[in-house]
């Protein structure tokens, strides 16, 4: 994931900062506890595509 892209894009739900999880190929919003998939290098920033992070999952 290009670090310049991470500086530009934001969570579509709260407009918060996203961080990249290299292991799971996901963009993480810590504020909303959502993980957005990255498919073929393309972030899928659709709320209905995101998975909720369990309370015990730390990223």
UniProtKB/Swiss-Prot annotation:
Pfam families: Trm112p. InterPro entries: Trm112-like (IPR005651). Signal peptide: none annotated. Disulfide bonds: none annotated. GO terms for cellular component: cytosol. Transmembrane segments: none annotated. PANTHER family: PROTEIN PREY, MITOCHONDRIAL, ZGC:162634. Belongs to the UPF0434 family. This is UPF0434 protein plu1633. It comes from Photorhabdus laumondii subsp. laumondii (strain DSM 15139 / CIP 105565 / TT01).
